[in-house]
UniProtKB/Swiss-Prot annotation:
Keyword annotations of the record: Aminoacyl-tRNA synthetase, ATP-binding, Cytoplasm, Ligase, Metal-binding, Nucleotide-binding, Protein biosynthesis, RNA-binding, tRNA-binding, Zinc
GO molecular function term, any single one: aminoacyl-tRNA deacylase activity
Cofactor: Zn(2+)
Protein's job: Catalyzes the attachment of alanine to tRNA(Ala) in a two-step reaction: alanine is first activated by ATP to form Ala-AMP and then transferred to the acceptor end of tRNA(Ala). Also edits incorrectly charged Ser-tRNA(Ala) and Gly-tRNA(Ala) via its editing domain.
Source species: Marinomonas sp. (strain MWYL1)
Subcellular compartments: Cytoplasm
Pfam families from the UniProt entry: DHHA1, tRNA-synt_2c, tRNA_SAD
Protein's GO biological process: alanyl-tRNA aminoacylation; negative regulation of DNA-templated transcription
Catalytic activity: tRNA(Ala) + L-alanine + ATP = L-alanyl-tRNA(Ala) + AMP + diphosphate
Name used for this protein in its record: Alanine--tRNA ligase
Gene of this entry: alaS
Domain description: Consists of three domains; the N-terminal catalytic domain, the editing domain and the C-terminal C-Ala domain. The editing domain removes incorrectly charged amino acids, while the C-Ala domain, along with tRNA(Ala), serves as a bridge to cooperatively bring together the editing and aminoacylation centers thus stimulating deacylation of misacylated tRNAs.
Binding sites annotated in the UniProt record for Zn(2+): 560, 564, 663, 667
Length: 872
């Protein structure tokens, strides 16, 4: 059975069992900012399992694209060395949200494996959690599996409920036992059954994991039964395909073999067994789908993981003799294999290839030189087996070699890298680049808000509704008195709840009491009105009049509609690769984050602004339609990055063919209502992500008027017209730069003179020189210049300089290269800085710090000679 046929067979089977087929979610989780990538099928249903979202179905099945590279779940370093590790894989899964439970879940798994796929029953065995007698009995009595084929796995991870067969979202929240199905590859493969000392061998391979979420674990470890137990299952498509196709390695299945052949062709090798071809075939899958889902190569977070994988693939191509660009050429082959199942790949394949090519070209500039540095470092190790952390860092910092790429080369040469030494220099980067999932929830102390609030605010800003619930500090109460604040749930409301980047409405609830609504948020489908009771008593059951602040709502609508016009303008001017990465829409302004590789030029800036204002002047009707998600996609509606949509969606259209987007927010009636659109700033907020801030309506007019007024004042200072003011400012700036250059020259001469004088104060210490001095300089740059001058004059020295200005202490330490083995500038600074209530750090040869306590400086300087003497 081909991989594509297996995928469809799984989905069709569970569809026949009344499961809703749900599309694979993005590799970038939209509902969990702590998770680097989607790494399991259940991720897109996390909010459902936690009771925070309600779907129109209680059974679902998916083929989920997953990535395990970076963060807690990281298979990158093993890809290419084992038969089953991948950075990208597909997880087949079926899910029950309070519907069926253990009996049906086990029956479905067994029927699909043995009846649909026709796997021989004698090849299968299962594990259950040691205490899960119910699952054991279902396997034994209902399925008929003999006792010797059912293995109980206890708490084998160091604590209660810490087991391979007990699954939890986090330290608290939903959890429960699981049962796993294993396939026996036969006695000719080394390995033992699960739970045995030889369980890590390849003979018995887990193919399906069925999790029974039946408990809620509180912070104190107490386990309580969930009112609606659920089921979460996962089966790796590649693993089961290998079994069905009669091969032992995932890389031998049809999907991978076709990619390996394509990789061999583009790198120019005929050896299809080359390990590097496996790496390249795996990496083109993860890299391509990351880019499809909006990830762009960068030096932090998800973008850095993508960059690491791309560069690892390039290095393996280089290892096979391919010195030119090649990786991007494999996108076409991948589309042939997976485009039918994932049409988003076909749609964006040209963009994917373009981004990969750009990254290849960038890395090609330093790859050969970096490899030479690494090879020299390896040859110079002698009998040592560890590449120094400083070398690993240099390769990263100067030549763009991720540490795991260097480790890959080291591993091929029977070596290791000094990870601890590298981490000292890279700690901050590693913290940004690596994140792990931490699902956590303590449901025992939370208030349940069931049902859904009927939202009437698309057509009305006033109404009447009954108070259904009042919440104060997480507890339901019967009433609120004047002066008290809380959350109010109404049966229906015109107040928009904060979502989709749009802030929540404000206004009033009036009835027996007068309550100011300061914000409106949402929990699931329930609107929570944040109220401050100004008069009377507000009680559950009261009938209240709802009044949305019309001026704030209208101002917000201007900005929200403008973001749609802006989004489309950016796509038309910059390219289809532009994707929304985030937004904030409030009454004052709009903020729009989008993917783009570089800063916008002045011409692009003007073109985007002009295009939006043209749409405003055309005064298009803003049309809203409600339709099913498939019809919306067929209409060409853009789904915004990270947003979750239900089966019925609102489609917002501006102009017959200009902007069509899915959006649940509130908007103007016609684009002309926006009046004027004015961009006030554009800049980068992360690698590959830009941010535009803009104003609309009266705020845009006021900003333009303010700029005109400021320009008039500047022109007045120069006694020039507004048109000539720019030339005057440019001339003044040129003059200032010339004077600054003269000043820098003078400061350099002064530093040289001061250095000559200070150098004579250096003392001999164990064959080197030591200079500790407080100097009179006005800025950190002058202090650095003085340090450089002294290092040049003293040749072999440890130097610590201090300066005090405006009650602030500046410290700088320098160590000449030959002494850094024993004395490191960073360590010296860390010793001295606390005495002046400061902190700092730096490299072994130069480090800096700042402090707020000049009184402690003398004592700190007195300690330096003894500290240095102990080390040189």
């Amino acid at each position: 059975m081909k991989s594509s046929e297996l995928r469809q067979s799984f989905l069709s089977y569970f569809e026949s069992k009344q499961h809703q087929i749900v599309e694979s979610s993005s590799l970038v989780p939209g509902n969990d900012p702590t998770l680097l990538f989607t790494n399991a099928g259940m991720v897109q249903f996390k909010d459902v399992f936690l009771g925070e979202d309600i779907r129109p179905y209680s059974r679902a099945t998916t083929s989920q694209r997953c990535v395990r590279a970076g963060g807690k779940h990281n298979d990158l370093e093993n890809v290419g060395y084992t038969a089953r590790h991948h950075t990208f894989f597909e997880m087949l899964g079926n899910f029950s949200f309070g519907d069926y439970f253990k009996k049906d879940a086990i029956h479905y798994a067994w029927e699909f494996l043995t009846v649909v796929l026709k796997l021989p029953t004698e090849k299968l065995l299962v594990t259950v959690y040691a205490d899960d007698d119910e699952a054991f009995d279902i396997w034994n009595k209902d399925i008929g599996l003999p006792v010797e084929k059912i293995i109980r796995i206890g708490d084998n991870k160091g604590g209660r409920y810490q087991s391979d067969n007990f699954w939890a979202m986090g330290d608290t929240g939903p959890c429960g036992p699981c049962t796993e199905v294993f396939y026996d590859h036969g006695e000719h493969i080394w390995g033992g059954p699960p739970g045995s000392p030889e369980e890590d061998g390849d003979r018995f391979i887990e193919i399906w994991n069925v999790v029974f979420m039946q408990f809620n674990r509180s912070a104190d470890g107490t386990m309580a039964s969930l009112p609606k137990p659920s089921v979460d299952t996962g089966m790796g498509l590649e693993r089961i395909a290998a079994i069905l196709q009669g091969v032992h390695s995932n890389y031998e299945i049809d999907l991978f073999q076709n990619l390996i052949k394509a990789a061999a062709q583009v790198v120019g090798t005929q050896d299809l067994s080359a390990q590097s071809l496996r790496v390249i075939a795996d990496h083109i899958r993860s890299c391509s789908f990351m880019i499809v889902d909006g990830v762009i190569p960068s030096n932090e977070g998800r973008g850095y993981v993508l960059r690491r994988i791309i560069r690892r693939a390039i290095r393996h191509g280089n290892k096979l003799g391919q010195k030119g660009v090649f990786f991007h050429k494999l996108v076409e082959a991948l589309d042939v294999e997976m485009g039918e199942a994932y049409p988003e790949l076909t749609k964006l394949k040209e963009r994917v290839a373009a981004i990969l090519l750009k990254e290849e070209e960038q890395f090609a500039k330093t790859l050969d030189q970096g490899m030479k540095i690494l090879e020299e470092a390896i040859s110079g190790l002698g009998d040592q087996k560890v590449i120094p952390g400083e070398t690993v860092f240099k390769l990263y910092d100067t030549y763009g070699f991720p540490a795991d790429l260097t480790n890959d080369v080291a591993r091929e040469n029977g070596l290791e890298i000094d990870e601890a030494g590298f981490e000292v220099a890279m700690d901050a980067q590693r913290a940004r680049a690596r994140s792990a999932s931490n699902f956590s929830m303590d449901m025992s102390g939370s208030v349940s808000v069931d049902g859904a609030t009927e939202f009437t605010g698309y057509s009305n800003l006033n109404g009447q509704s009954a108070v259904e619930q009042i919440i104060v500090e997480g507890e339901s109460v019967s009433s609120l008195q004047a002066g008290q604040t809380g959350l109010v749930v109404l049966a229906e409301t015109p107040f928009y709840g904060e979502s989709g980047g749009q802030v929540g409405d404000q206004g009033w609830l009036r009835g027996p009491a007068a309550a100011k609504v300061t914000n409106t948020t949402k929990q699931g489908k329930v609107h929570l009105h944040h109220v401050d009771v100004r008069e009377g008593t507000l009680a559950v059951g009261d009938l209240v009049t709802t009044e949305v602040d019309r001026s704030l709502r209208n101002a917000t609508a201007l900005n929200h509609s403008a973001t749609h016009l802006l989004h489309e303008a950016l796509r038309r001017v910059l390219g289809d690769h532009v994707q929304q990465k985030g937004s904030l829409v409030n009454p004052e302004r709009l903020r729009f984050d989008f993917s783009h590789f570089e800063g916008m030029t002045a011409a692009e800036f003007e073109q985007v602004e002009d295009m939006v204002n043209e749409q405003v002047r055309l005064n298009h009707e803003v049309v809203t339609e409600v339709m099913d998600i498939d019809s919306a996609k067929a209409k060409g509606a853009q789904a915004l990055f990270g947003e979750k949509y239900e089966s019925q969606v609102r489609v917002l259209t501006m102009g017959a063919d200009y902007s069509i987007e899915l959006c649940g927010g509130t908007h103007v009636s016609r684009t002309g209502d926006i009046g004027l659109f004015k961009i006030v700033s554009e800049g980068g907020i992360a690698s590959g992500v830009r941010r535009i801030e803009a104003l609309t309506g009266k705020a845009a007019i006021d900003a333009t008027r303010h700029t005109e007024t400021a320009l008039g004042k500047i022109a007045g200072l120069f006694k020039a017209s507004k048109e000539a003011a720019l030339d005057k400012v440019v001339a003044l700036n040129d003059q200032a730069r010339a004077l600054q250059k003269e000043l820098d020259v003078l400061k350099g001469k002064m530093a040289a003179l001061a250095g000559a004088d200070l150098a004579s104060q250096a003392v001999d210490i164990n064959g080197g020189k030591l200079l500790v001095a407080q100097v009179e300089v006005e800025d950190p740059k002058a202090l650095r210049d003085l340090l450089d001058e002294l290092k040049s004059k003293l040749e072999s020295a440890v130097i610590l300089l201090a300066a005090v200005n405006d009650g602030k202490v500046s410290l700088i330490a320098g160590v000449t290269k030959e002494l850094t083995k024993n004395v490191k500038a960073g360590d010296l600074i860390k010793m001295v800085a606390p005495y002046v209530d400061g902190k700092g750090g730096g490299r072994p040869d130069m480090a800096q710090a700042g402090g707020n306590n000049p009184e402690g400086l003398s004592a700190a300087l007195e300690l330096v000679p003894g500290w240095v003497a102990e080390r040189v």
